[in-house]
């Protein structure tokens, strides 16, 4: 090895090794603060897209109304285009014929995207044990938060959204999303 290369390991641009590490760590601190600011912005500006097929969709409408005011948690206006939304709220029964449609909607959403399964029908098929009903939307798309109930109360929906916001704020890893392959995905 050349003498300059060996010397470059010890010092950088005429600084001692500790000075170089201090200067480099300042850049990392800035990056971590920037990540925290981005997470704060994502947490407080969720744009939900409701996919309501049953009574849970009616409950979601009441949560979006003035009595419960979901806007104070950052979910201001429901979006009806997947390209403008980052939170897919699946509220109601999902049948086998609906599955390719919901997968396509999920694929059209921009990253980062989140899925909230609202109610017993979306989470586990509900009381329908028929051949045409999916036993949970997590069979076709990855779900971040499950909200129990038939239908869930507006307070439970708000708790589910706040749980999702806590997950976003802490940058929790989502391994179920990274390795997900849906049986309905198009190549």
From Swiss-Prot:
[4Fe-4S] cluster binds at residues 55-56, 121, 150. One of its GO terms (cellular component) is respiratory chain complex I. PROSITE patterns: COMPLEX1_20K (PS01150). The keyword 4Fe-4S applies. It catalyses: a quinone + NADH + 5 H(+)(in) = a quinol + NAD(+) + 4 H(+)(out). SUPFAM superfamilies: HydA/Nqo6-like. Its EC number is 7.1.1.-. Its main location: membrane. NDH-1 is composed of 14 different subunits. Subunits NuoB, C, D, E, F, and G constitute the peripheral sector of the complex. HAMAP family: NDH1_NuoB. This is NADH-quinone oxidoreductase subunit B. It comes from Bdellovibrio bacteriovorus (strain ATCC 15356 / DSM 50701 / NCIMB 9529 / HD100).
């Amino acid at each position: 090895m050349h003498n300059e290369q060996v010397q470059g390991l010890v010092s950088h641009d005429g600084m001692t090794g500790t000075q170089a590490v201090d200067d480099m760590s300042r850049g990392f601190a800035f990056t971590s603060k920037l990540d925290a600011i981005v997470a704060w912005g994502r947490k407080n500006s969720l744009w939900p897209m409701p996919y309501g097929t049953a009574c849970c969709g009616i409950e979601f409408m009441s949560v979006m109304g003035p009595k419960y005011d979901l806007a104070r948690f950052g979910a201001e206006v429901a979006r009806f285009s997947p390209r403008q939304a980052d939170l897919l709220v699946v509220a109601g029964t999902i049948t086998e014929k609906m599955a390719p449609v919901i997968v396509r909607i999920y694929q059209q959403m921009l990253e980062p995207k989140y899925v909230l399964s609202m109610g017993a029908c979306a989470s586990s098929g509900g009381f329908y044990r028929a051949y045409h009903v999916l036993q949970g939307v997590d069979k076709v798309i990855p779900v971040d938060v499950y909200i129990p109930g038939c239908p869930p109360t507006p307070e439970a929906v708000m708790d589910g959204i706040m749980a999702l916001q806590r997950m976003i704020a802490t940058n929790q890893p989502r391994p179920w999303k990274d390795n997900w392959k849906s049986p309905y995905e198009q190549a």
